[in-house]
Amino acid sequence: EEIKKSTGGNPPPVFDPFAGGGTIPLEAQRLGLKAIAADLNPVAVMINKAMIEIPAKFQDRPPVNPAAKSLLAAEWQGAQGLASDIAYYGKLLKEKAFAKIGHLYPKVKVPETGQEATVIAWIWARTVKCPNPACGCEMPLVKSFWLSKKAGKEAYLEPIVEDGKVRFEVRRGKGKVREGTVSRTGAQCICCGASVPGRYIRDESKAGRMKARMLALVADLNPGRGYMPADNFHIKTADVEKPMDYPEQEMNQDTPDLVSGRGYGITHWHQLFTHRQLTALTTFSALINDVQKQVVADGGTKEYSEAIATYLAFVVDRQANYSSTGNAWSGDFIVQTFGRQALPMVWDYAESNPFSDATGNWDGAIKWITLAIKRLPCWKSAKVIQCLAQKDNGVRNVLVSTDPPYYDNIGYADLSDFFYIWLRRSLKDIYPENFSTMLVPKAEELVATPYRFDGSKQDAKEFFEQGMFEVCQNIYQYTMQEFPVTIYYA
């Protein structure tokens, strides 16, 4: 009412030319205003479509899945019907995936009970050969040997050196836990104690001689967790061929925000995933098309099936965030790949089980997304466009509210590629214009990144400031003169 009163009963649409994660357009829609979101980054564009554009198209519609047909008499408000279908078809996709790759995620026998338990994580460490000629141990690079620090349930790995080799046993309680073997400056050989400089580790990785070794398994004992050393069966099960259709896109090797820019010879995105992880993610992604056809068979329109596919593609993206070699094991759970706005090297990592009930599982990703969808406002139509903020996109008579990029604070385009490669696989046939490039567009991204200007901070600064000047000129064209423009710059 206050908005109507302040706008003469005719509130203008709210336009954000740097929509990003969609907060401003979403909250404008929640206030009952038409929202228009724009961004150059296709990942941001898809996030905004999923939050403000798609739900508004299918507002108050009942689901089409067979399980919900007995509830058709019920009132489906907002995006509840959409959420119901995402949950149903997400479960169907999981069942199809398990039929194909479930054997790659076997259970483990718990020694104390003889019962089988679901593995929720496999703990791995990267390894390089010790440079000491008298040693030559395949030395594990471990940040911490702790498995659990939970009071009364402490567990840790004890490395045992025998005949120049190392094996691991799981110990419980508050024993003397060995310090980790790797730091920012280098590592220490667990067998001979030799100090190993970081440059040697980088050179070994560049030469393709860095390996990975499974150290332990974490099992769901329901209740509680069980920890046990890796066995040959689980090691062999994890040793699968790389899938034929893995994502082959290159990583940016000029930015320190990515591990590819830190001298380890990591040059392509697929190198951030184990072969088992690649197999799972490509399988989930490929099955979206099958499920999309099932939506149509159950009575949904083609457009509606594409909407369901869009959300399932985001489930795959969320799955990828918990299914890479960038997932540390900390605090008794798997840490997401993007614990911060960078992709550093993670020495000892946790491989999740998408078919478990713990962190990194498919069901959890579905639940997270459907809970969010149920709470979306979706009562006003919205528009999302992919465009360059420095160019006039033709929007007029709007109220502009935006949170622009901050010089070189965050390289969103470089980081977004992690999610883009999976979204593109799943959605390029539905949104060909948004996924026309192999990677996220970067050259025109409005950030002051020196590496894009041969290392010149001054040129990067001038590019950013000139670009922001052009953006402000465009905003003057877009906005209704009787309303102020709000720009958040902290």
Regions found by a protein language model. Name each.
Residues G21:
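Conserved SAM/SAH-binding loop
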Residues E1-F15, P25, Q29-V398, P405, ...:
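Nucleic-acid modification enzymes, centered on SAM-dependent nucleic-acid methyltransferases
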Residues F18:
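Conserved redox-active cysteine motifs that mediate thiol-disulfide chemistry
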Residues E465-F483:
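A short glycine-rich, Lys/Arg-flanked "PGG" loop and its adjoining helix->strand segment in the class I
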Residues Q458-F463:
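Nucleic-acid endo/exonuclease domains
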